Amino acid sequence: MDVETLLSDVRAEELWGAIVSAGEREALLRETLPFNELLTLTFSAKESLFKALYPQVRCYFDFLDARMVAVDTQRQTFVLALLKTLTPNCPAGRRFSGHFWREGDDVTTFIFC
């Protein structure tokens, strides 16, 4: 689980390269929500993934080692895919589903593994 405060438009433009790849950014820009909201959601989702997996895999991985592959704003769900093999049970390509909600300026995400 993770909670993040909504990034401003300016901050999102400054930070996106550390959170998402150029291709992932382009995909987020095609979504209906504003980019800063989607980047905050992606940041929080990737933090949730790290918090869920690190106790199992015991190896460091960063934001660019996972990719947001789906966001459903109606159902408030998302899917992340690993781009790096972490362990035999967590190979590249493995997908993780999660949920999110927004309350005021806070975005909360969680993933069950």
Question: What role is predicted for each listed range?
Answer:
Residues 1-113:
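Core catalytic alpha/beta fold that binds nucleotide/phospho-ligands
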